[in-house]
Regions:
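Cys-dependent protein tyrosine phosphatase-like superfamily
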Residues: 1-207, 221-322
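Ser/Thr-glycine-rich phosphate-binding loops at phosphate-binding pockets of nucleotides
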Residues: 213, 217-218
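Hydrophobic anchor at the beta1->P-loop junction of P-loop NTPases
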Residues: 209-211
Length: 322
């Protein structure tokens, strides 16, 4: 398969090709050290908005690769869900499903970069209270769909704030609270996920969905979508845990502020704050276990709760994997 962008190698050359006339790449002509050179020296792309998808061709086999995390200055957890292997030996397509934190601080100057992703629909999973004053800032050609998935999320957080400040919640209790929250998301998220999958099924254009931090509701939404595509649970968990990596600087800043505030509020639970701001394999497993215990497993949940028939699921898999 030699279409789009791809790398071609023979005994003497290692060439990166592109179908974009605005992008200029280097050609490496080394033999034994070629892999080292390619990995340590990024190809020069003149068009900074262009996101290349690269077909790596070796011995007749092709693997499509791309950068998972997509950098925007104030949107820290924006990433592509593609590139994951399924239990059927397929791969989730790059550039079809995107997840992120809220887009209220997406800059107008970054609209070209956003539009380069060809996203036509954005699903906002936040509650109206969360959105107020933090509305998504989107290019005018992008459709916005408000699909709140957890109706009481704002009340949950506001109710916890005073307890955290006064040290009324232990670290273990905060983990239990998050686990219960994830169990609740499973049921509350069904209408939003149904709408999201219907759009994916009927449109060839990429979609994006997000909540506030892009980790909990967005994480479960991603886990369910990948389950529909028959990605195994450990791979789903690994993808979910990436939120801690991409949000690490933001979380570190918040924890630094919390440690300073602890001087005034000595009972403030810094560990509790960290548990609320982080992802945890235990949280997502609570959601999986809830589905297994209450709905007869993931396949039954997909069919009976999400309303996706075997034929529809096959169609979704064909559309979103290769």
């Amino acid at each position: 398969m030699q279409e789009g962008n791809y790398i071609e190698n023979d005994k003497n050359t290692y060439t990166l090709h592109t179908n974009d006339d605005a992008a200029k790449f280097e050609t490496y002509t080394l033999q034994d050290t070629v892999k080292k050179n390619v990995s340590s020296k990024e190809p020069v792309i003149k068009n900074k908005h262009h996101r290349p998808y690269i077909n790596m061709i070796e011995n007749g086999d092709t693997a499509i690769i791309a950068n998972r995390h997509i950098y925007f200055k104030k949107v820290v957890n924006f990433r592509d869900v593609g590139g994951l292997k399924t239990t059927q030996g397929k791969t989730v397509k790059w550039g079809k499903i995107y997840r992120s934190d809220n887009l209220s601080q997406l800059r107008t100057g970054e609209f070209d970069k956003f539009n380069d992703l060809q996203i036509k629909t954005v699903f906002d999973l936040r509650t109206p209270q969360e959105i107020e004053g933090k509305e998504d800032h989107l290019p005018p050609n992008v459709s916005y769909v408000h699909a709140p998935s957890v109706l009481d999320h704002g009340d949950l957080l506001s109710g916890m704030r005073s307890k955290v400040l006064n040290g009324e919640i232990s670290d273990e209790e905060s983990i239990q609270i998050m686990a219960e929250f994830y169990r609740g998301i499973v049921a509350d998220n069904v209408p939003a996920l149904k709408q999201l999958l219907q759009t994916i099924l009927n449109s060839d254009a990429p979609v994006l969905y997000h909540c506030s931090a892009g980790k909990d509701r967005t994480g479960i939404t991603t886990a369910l979508i990948l389950s529909v595509l028959k990605v195994d649970r450990q791979t789903i968990i690994n993808e979910y845990l990436l939120s801690d990596y991409y949000r690490r600087q933001k979380v570190e800043r918040m924890l630094t502020k919390a440690k300073i505030a602890k001087v005034i509020k000595p009972r403030l639970g810094v560990g509790v704050i960290q548990n609320f701001m982080s992802v945890n394999e235990r949280y997502l497993n609570e959601a999986f276990n809830y589905i297994d215990s209450n709905y007869g497993g993931m396949d039954a949940f997909i069919k009976n709760q999400l309303g996706i028939s075997d034929a529809q699921r096959k169609q979704i898999i064909e559309k979103l994997t290769y």
